[in-house]
């Protein structure tokens, strides 16, 4: 591996051992498949931000990552790097139907995000085959706007100013590379980014593949009963967007069967110690039912400290 980090053997102020970057990254080898419900936040509702001041983090506060594996390069890039355009083009092909008048997925937030990309250098130096969009808020910094706020109330995540927050969004993999290699490289890159930027809390929206939330009533009931975050991290849908579905009791379904039926990345995040916020949102534009995932990096270290890459 070409991405070893050399750090002193010490404890951070959150009790995380800083000499275990490999162990931290190792959990992401668990993901084997890419699904349509990858964790990303899609369109930012213009109606929700029309009269809202949007604050962003200075790019000077973030650290880059870059490493190689076989024919691939994994790194973070930012505007105006032309590779960001390649990332946007891949996102558009992954999320939307083809439109000859549009070739890339882009919005106002791209300028302020880090774009984690996987490049197949055997094709070219800018052939992006995987991408993630990351928005970071370091501890003790002014609150910034996140995409999840278009669907969920996440105010409680900001209560503790000692926590560094990161939203992960716009995850996608080229259709010809969906054999597990690229998603694992993306997640390893994500883990490295989390480590060097001292991220404490990761969150983002995850989707079920239909806006008919009743189709997933048992799954949503299971998540609500078994994987809700603690009160200090509790989040809930914006009320007018809240999905309406039958609430099942635990005695009315089989836990193991329901867990197996969850979308692959929701299962992967739960295995990594993630919580799922209360309720869900129906996104009729993208025909999905969305939930909010909240993940503590301390939980990741604790749960997977004995694994190696």
Predicted feature residues:
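Acyl-donor binding region in acyl/amide transferases
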Residues: 137-274, 280-281, 287-288
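A structural microfeature
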Residues: 129-130, 278
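Long, continuous compositionally biased terminal/linker segments
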Residues: 292-309
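Conserved N-terminal entry element of GNAT/NAT acetyltransferase domains
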Residues: 23-80
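A short helix-loop-beta-strand connector motif used in the catalytic cores of GNAT acetyltransferases and
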Residues: 108-117, 142, 286-291
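Intrinsically disordered, low-structural-confidence terminal and linker regions
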Residues: 1-33
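Short amphipathic alpha-helix that is part of the acyltransferase structural core
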Residues: 60-129, 136
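Conserved hydrophobic/aromatic beta-strand scaffold that supports enzyme active sites
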Residues: 115-117, 131, 165, 292-294
